[in-house]
């Protein structure tokens, strides 16, 4: 019975802490994204009538290129992190085989 109480308490504590951390992280990332794209204000102020202009198409293309570059960096970072985990697992397996 005590384990169920500990689980429920831990679950609720994890939910609260996760919500706080997620909220803070979300606001920081949203603020950073807003400061990195000053061209967004320009697009918003031009109105709907000029959405097909060459300048707006070029602006959208640059934004997409930037986002793709950011995604590639994140993918490379995760690949590196997972590579280190795989290396550690392989070392542990080899050590266990030699025992």
From Swiss-Prot:
Q: Where in the cell is it found?
A: Cellular thylakoid membrane
Q: Which residues form a coiled coil?
A: 50-84
* Membrane topology listed for this record: Single-pass membrane protein
Keyword RNA-binding assigned to the entry: answer is no
Q: Which UniProt keywords apply?
A: Coiled coil, Membrane, Thylakoid, Transmembrane, Transmembrane helix
Mind telling me which residue stretches traverse the membrane in this protein? 10-30
Sorted alphabetically, the Gene Ontology cellular component annotations on this record are: plasma membrane-derived thylakoid membrane
- InterPro entries xrefs: Ssl2009-like
**Keyword Thylakoid annotated:** yes
What PANTHER family does UniProt report for this protein, alphabetically? LOW-DENSITY RECEPTOR-LIKE PROTEIN
The name this protein carries in UniProt is Thylakoid membrane protein ssl2009
The organism is Synechocystis sp. (strain ATCC 27184 / PCC 6803 / Kazusa)
